[in-house]
Design a protein with these regions (language model features):
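Conserved catalytic network of the ASCE P-loop NTPase/AAA+ motor domain
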Residues: 81-86, 137-141, 172-176, 202
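Canonical P-loop GTPase G-domain recognition
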Residues: 168-181, 186-212
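Conserved structured core elements
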Residues: 13, 28-33, 163, 167, ...
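Short, motif-level signal for alpha-helix interfacial/capping segments enriched in acidic residues
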Residues: 71-76, 161-165, 173
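Conserved G1/Walker A P-loop phosphate-binding module
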Residues: 1-121, 139
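Short, conserved acidic/polar surface loops in the N-terminal third of protein domains
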Residues: 101-106, 157-160, 193
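Conserved Switch II/interswitch segment of TRAFAC-class P-loop GTPases
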Residues: 113-164, 181, 187-191
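Hydrophobic/aromatic beta-strand patches that form the interior of the parallel beta-sheet core
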Residues: 17, 91-93, 143-147, 181-183, ...
Length: 212
């Protein structure tokens, strides 16, 4: 039995891919690429395909946080065909991610933004809401995890600012024994320093895969 058959058997064919990690790493961009490559081509109905395309999260460059809450994409699972005639019904789960120094959008006039959430009657800070939502995606809403990390080249935020948040996400996934892969997002994938980071990532996460 290959990995695809194993996943299909364990999940009865329904799979929720939780795309997690720090803010401003490219999580929404990963979801968009995945949807455009593997999901949209498998939707035969033109109207459903257009509606699903409209559900794809926005993404952008820079330091400003784009995602404000967890989101299931698409609204209904879509069957995709993988290797060896294995079929899976897939939904992606986007999240805000853990806040890192240098990111923008979670503060206003030097103070934490307050937001209303379905998890509390009282308003809470954007950062608190982001943490709760991200933990829920990791623990409650995903079958497998895709941890998106970056060398900082995609946002201009220093690489070191991401490390603590990355480690938190990976430690949480390991603590609940949830399978995951690590995706390294970089504007300079061919540079020696990026390849070195990938090797370091792979050596640390020896039981998991690290992709560009």
């Amino acid at each position: 039995m290959n990995i695809y058959e194993d996943i299909a058997k364990r999940t009865q064919g329904d799979i929720y891919i939780g795309v997690v990690g720090p803010v401003r790493t490219g999580k929404s961009t990963f979801i968009r690429k995945f949807m455009e490559t593997l999901v949209l081509p498998n939707i035969d109905n033109e109207f459903k395909r257009d509606r699903t395309r409209d559900e794809i999260p926005q993404s952008g460059s820079g330091k400003t946080i784009m995602t404000v809450e967890p989101k299931f994409v698409p609204a209904d699972g879509v069957v995709i065909e993988l290797k060896d005639a294995v079929s899976l019904k897939v939904r992606m789960v986007d999240c805000v991610g853990y806040i890192v120094d240098g990111a923008l959008g979670h503060e206003e006039n030097g103070k934490q933004r307050l937001v209303s959430t379905p998890w509390s009657k009282d308003a809470m800070t954007f950062e608190e809401a982001a943490e709760i939502g991200t933990k829920k995606v990791i623990r409650d809403h995903s079958t497998i995890g895709v941890v998106v990390i970056t060398d900082g080249s995609v946002t201009g935020i220093e690489r070191g600012n991401y490390i603590e948040a990355e480690e938190r996400v990976i430690d949480e996934l390991k603590s609940i024994q949830k399978p995951f892969v690590v995706v390294l997002n970089s504007m300079t994938p061919k540079e020696e320093k990026t390849e070195l980071l990938r090797k370091v990532c792979r050596s640390v996460e020896e039981n998991h895969l690290c992709y560009f």
